[in-house]
Each structure stands twice: as C-alpha cells, then as structure tokens.
Amino acid sequence: MHKYLGKGVRKQENITDMAIAANTANTDQKRENLLNLSLSVSEEERMRSESLETGFDREERTWELIVKYFGDLSGLRERGIRVRELLNGYGILKVPEYLVDFVTNLPEIEYIEKPKRLFFAVNQARAASCLLDVQQGIGGETANSNPLENIFGMDGGTVTERVSAEAKLPTDLTGKGVLIAIIDSGIDYLHPDFQNPDGTSRILYLWDQNRDIVYTKEEINEALSAYREGSGGRNRAAALQIVPSADTSGHGTAVSAIAAGNGRGSSGLYRGVAYESELMVVKLGIPLADNFPRTTQLMEAVDFVLRTARQLGRPVAVNLSFGNTYGSHDGTSLLETFLDDMTGYGRNVIIAGTGNEGAGAGHTGGLLEMGREQVIELSVSAFENSFGVQLWKSYADIFSISLRSPSGAIIGTLQENLEKQRFRSENTEILSYYGKPSPY
C-alpha cells in the first residue's frame, strides 16, 4: 500500500521518497528516486516492500526498466540485455543487475524508471454519461416519444422493433467502423455480446501477454465453432484447446461489455457504448510474484494496439481501466509522457479510468506559509507492515521535513543528500531518498 503527499505544478521536485522495509547508493539523476532507492537497499529489505520489489526478477537477477532514449539500442542485445523498442523513443529493457549502472551512463539513455504495479479502475455510469442520448439521437424521429422505452421495451415492443426505431434516428453513433482496444485482464470471448449476429467473433485480435501469443479472429472463430459442437452447444474445454485464454477475474470482460457489448446475451437489454465496433483485446501479463500487471506491460499493450490499428487504417479508442496513484500527478512520468505522445500516433483516443480511491484519503496538498509548520497525519493500520510516502514540491520552494513517531519521538530534519538515508524509530525502519529536479 502507498500513501502519497503533495501535488504541485509542472517541473516539480521529488524531494523525498520514503519506504518502510531498506547496497550500493547511486546518485545518478538519470534515474527516478524510487529506482535509486530500490537499487540501494538489501534484497531482504526490497522483498519487504511491494513498491521496491516490482520489476526485479530474483531468479534471473534482472531488472525490468522503462527508458526514454534516442538513437539505436541494438548494441545492448550483445550484452545480454533484452530490448523492446516502443514508439516515439520509449523502450522496455530487461537488464542484468550488474549492468544497470552501465545502461544508466550510456549517452543515448535520457531517463530511466522502474515499473509500477497496476490496479483496477473502472467507471460504469453509462446512463449518467448521457450515452443513451448519444446512441439514440434525441430529438430525431422515433417510434415512441419516450427514448427509454425504445431501449428497454417499456412499450412491450420486440428487440427488433426497438432496433428498427433506432435506425431512423439521425445520430446513430454505434461504433460501426471503429476499433475498441481493451487493455485489461482479458475477455470471455465465448460471451455472445462479443459475437456478430451470424455467430462470428467481433474480436479481431486477442494478445495474451502471459502466453505471448496473438490470437486472430479466424482462430477465435474456430474456437467458437468447437464450443458450439459440444453437448448443449457449450463445450468450453474444446474452445480453450484452440484459444486457451481466459479472463479469470472477469474485470476485462465487464469493461469490454460496458465499452462495446452488443447486448446479444440479454436480447438487447444490456448494451454497451460502441456496440457495433470491432475489438482488439490485450490480456495484461501477471508476474508469478504479483497479483496485478505492471506499467511496462501496459506500455507494450498500447504500442501493440496503436501499431495494429494504423496497419489496418482504422480509428481506435483505447480503454485503460488499470492504473495507480504513484508520482507527482503532473503528467511528467515516463508512462504519462508516453501516453501523451501516443495520442498523436494515427487516429486514436486513449481513455483512462478515474480510479477507485476517491474515499481513500491517500493524497493531500496545499500551500505552506513562510515560517509556519504544518502537521500531516499518516494513518497506518495494525497489520500494515510496509508503505511508501512521496513528497513533491515546486523547484523554487524551500522547506524542511521531519517525522514524529506515535510515541512522540522526532526523526529528522531529513537531509538534502542525493543518497539513501536510514533511520530507526522503535520497531520501524525508515528509508529516505532525496532527489533533485529531473526531466521526467
């Protein structure tokens, strides 16, 4: 769990990144604070913190890293570094632990961040977003003066009659001709909402990152045929022999239905937004040590769907219902700048969930007055054995930070040193890393 403090203007300075949990200190400002702190602690300490451990493979002794670079990275492969080049000068590297400093010092590497864990974030307020009005074309010629009756059949009409009435409306925004890309936990491709009236799949591509296989529409159609040949027309095992990708959490299927379900599974009653669109789905990979995917996998997924949409010459809406609350929230992290840059590639829009942390009290911010002290309390549960705190400020501002334990002991003032600082208070170990302004 993370709790974060502070939110300011662009060109913020991450003055400290603290973690409870904490070998070599590296002060290179081409790396983010959290990565520097992760590299400077012992492996035992790293294992006690989810945020510090994310991206490190203990068996291979490698780090997964996000880089912003220029030029050519092909020479890194000769040193045993795995390179995945993304669009617009972004890349994902799998670097042996002993080569991280070497990679950092390369002139073509502009900045490095470590991956972060992602969590579910989805909004389901279809009606509150006025989508019914958009789909129906309010103000047009309808078979019934009440638009809701055309959707839900309050007039007793059939689904066919309701669809015929909608076809007369001037707006008629159904998603036809558009691609919807769902980057999530996968999809139940056997669900009728993701099939055309003739029983073929609406999914053009399904990339299962866990298997690193891209399944085509033809393969999914073959799986659907095998499914229908079973007893009672439902042989899931036969289908999974052909396309063995499943959405175990159901989150991706629900998101896909909200965005693009055509309502066939409910006789047209529960229909999504772009119900005549076609889909591309990426099932984000889940490392064995974690329950959720990482930002690196999200970036690879966005790169894949945008490249594919451009090859097909189609507009695409990319839905991201995973996220996290890490960082300064000013749009300058490598993930955020990557998504900003990607909006100019081809014809696309990228949509991100607003999160589920509205009542979590995980952030605070405001203005400090000259010469005055402000106290901010952190609530830590009895069973919470590690958490992280970030403080961000504008570059020109100067202030000091100290910590007060539950017993009243004062720790600090924290020093402005570009290195790991270690403190101990009662049974709590505190690690701090002070950082200077960076380009990202």
Report the location of each language-model feature.
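Autoinhibitory N-terminal propeptides
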Residues: M1-G91, Y98-L169
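Short strand-edge motifs at loop-to-beta-strand transitions and within beta-strands
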Residues: G91, Q374-I376
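Short alpha-helical segments and helix-capping/turn motifs at coil-helix boundaries
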Residues: V95-Y98, Q135-F152, V159-L169, V178, ...
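Short, well-ordered alpha-helical packing segments
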Residues: T104, Q135, F152, V163-E166, ...
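Surface-exposed acidic, glycine/proline-enriched linker/cap segments
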Residues: L132-E161, V214-P244, E429-Y440
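Subtilisin-like serine protease catalytic core
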Residues: A167-T296, G313-A317, R347, N385, ...
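Substrate-binding/access-modulating region of protease and related hydrolase catalytic domains
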Residues: I286-L368, R372, F383-I410, E419-Y440
